[in-house]
């Protein structure tokens, strides 16, 4: 998985409903990632994305709006190894 890849992300909103959208993987490192999406994602929710070979999972630490969309910072789960 490379930066600028399109990925399908999923999370549960505060009421427990499954949500999902397409995102652009802006940045990734061993401790987390930054995704660009078209809608806000609540802070603290668990979010995941990936392919059959690798599933990424973590928690939303920030979600800020910029001119081209929302940027979501994800801290990987402590058990996750990239």
Predicted feature descriptions by range:
Residues 1-82:
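Structured alpha-helical
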């Amino acid at each position: 998985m490379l930066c600028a890849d399109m990925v399908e992300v999923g999370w549960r909103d505060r009421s427990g409903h499954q949500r999902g959208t397409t995102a652009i993987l802006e940045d990734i490192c061993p401790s987390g990632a930054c995704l660009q999406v078209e809608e806000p994602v609540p802070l603290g929710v668990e979010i995941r994305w990936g392919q059959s070979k690798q599933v990424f999972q973590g928690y939303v630490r920030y979600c800020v709006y910029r001119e081209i969309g929302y940027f979501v910072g994800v801290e990987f789960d402590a058990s996750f190894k990239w």
